[in-house]
């Protein structure tokens, strides 16, 4: 194993950053995940682009960026202001059915919310759509494992606490969050450099309106790719009972975590549907970011560090 050029240059990339008007945040340049290209990637999905069409539905009166044909995965760091910075970071996994990525609704907007509570948001642009003949989840899991390890590997360089690095995701991204939280001891790819010697176990896990966790045709058994153990990280779950993706996804995961004695908090709301992110509405479910903040505070993730 050795330190590759991409690892050496990442700290330089962070130095070339822009300031966001929200909360005085600093946004890094995008950082490629893989020094020599992503594993198992053929690059034959077409040009990356926003697939949203004029007639596509709005969320809270706003359009959604639906990014498709991602073959070059990367992370972008959203840093909170120095006054708020807790040293905690969260990898953010947008949803989109493993077909597209809802990059603003379930990505940039979430990173900005994390900044407001002193957390660095690490926006993960993982590979979509599923390639013909490939398992739906393998390439995204490779990217998520690599992202978590890369952030932890650079924790000192980026002034982060290596013991406060978690993951949050929505819908398919919530499945990716749960997968990362239950397979961190088994790399989905051959290690490529020193970053892969670092654990990819999240310190906290936040699947929001998850998909693919329950097997509908098998009496809602938990999906076999999710190996919940006592080492699965503390987990926070949100879902609406009228979610068309089925609330059983949260229920079976909650029970598996509870039976494994993993700290878990779940909030179910009578209505809210699916795919709302944290955009405001008149529904009670719009209060979930406050519940999430309280949960993170209870874990000690929002304590400011001593100067």
Where does each model-flagged region fall?
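N-terminal cap/lid segment of alpha/beta-hydrolase-fold proteins
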Residues: 25-85
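Short beta-strand element of the alpha/beta-hydrolase
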Residues: 86-95
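Active-site glycine-rich loops that stabilize anionic/oxyanionic intermediates
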Residues: 94-99, 241
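Catalytic nucleophile-loop/oxyanion-hole region of alpha/beta-hydrolase
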Residues: 101-103, 109-110, 124-161, 279-285
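Primarily recognizes the serine-hydrolase "nucleophile elbow" in alpha/beta-hydrolase
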Residues: 142-230
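Short beta-strand/loop motif that positions the catalytic acidic residue
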Residues: 237-239
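Conserved alpha/beta-hydrolase "acid-adjacent" motif
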Residues: 244-250
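C-terminal catalytic histidine-bearing segment of alpha/beta-hydrolase fold enzymes
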Residues: 251-307
